[in-house]
Amino acid sequence: MMRTPKILLFLFISCLCFGCQSSLRRESRIEKQDDVYVLSFANLSFSVSAGKGGRIVSFKCEDRELLTSDSVHSKYYGATFWLSPQSEYWPQYQCVDELPYQAEIDKQILRLVSPPDSISGVSVTKEFSISERDSSILIHYSVRNVSRQLKRLAPWDVTRVYGGLSFFPVGETDRMNKSDVTGGYEDKGMVWVPCPDGTNERGQKLLSTAYGGWMAH
């Protein structure tokens, strides 16, 4: 009997906006607005659309939106989970990225499950909650093989944001480390990628090892 391979991805999104630590209500809650579930805590608001592939459609701090909306691009907006490598999983399966997910709330955890799909052979589960200890958003993605074939894939977290400065601690030297991103540079153990609004007129990629398990924008 074939074992069901499972891939787990833990993501911690911390809001770095000044002023988020406030005297407002210090209890997290989950509210449903049509097919969108809104997780909120203090000055944070985090919205996930069950009807749009379990996509993260909004992340706000002090009412300031950090993710791009469908007004920027009708298809590629917000934040989502993809399968990789792109050479084998493109375009993304609709059941993973676009079709409705089944939603349930377990205490203070929002759980979304994609329907088992015979074409992709996978089912994706997404869990979202808020850590009241440090105001971070806890995201847990898992992929289940529902086919009878071996699956080789890796998780790919995709986040679309407005222009700004992205940075992360660089890891070890690797032959895969390469970039054609305009303006990116390495300094003091960090990779810095300035991306002003309106300046990216072509597709660009930066491939790099990382250290510390975080990236900030």
Language-model region placement:
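Generic recognition of long tandem-repeat/solenoid scaffolds
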Residues: 37-40, 59, 108-115, 207
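Bacterial Sec-dependent signal peptides at the C-terminal "C-region" and cleavage site
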Residues: 12, 16-29
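Extended, loop-rich substrate-binding clefts of extracytoplasmic carbohydrate-active enzymes
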Residues: 24-28, 85-136, 148, 152-153, ...
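Hydrophobic beta-strand positions in extracellular immunoglobulin-like domains
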Residues: 142-143
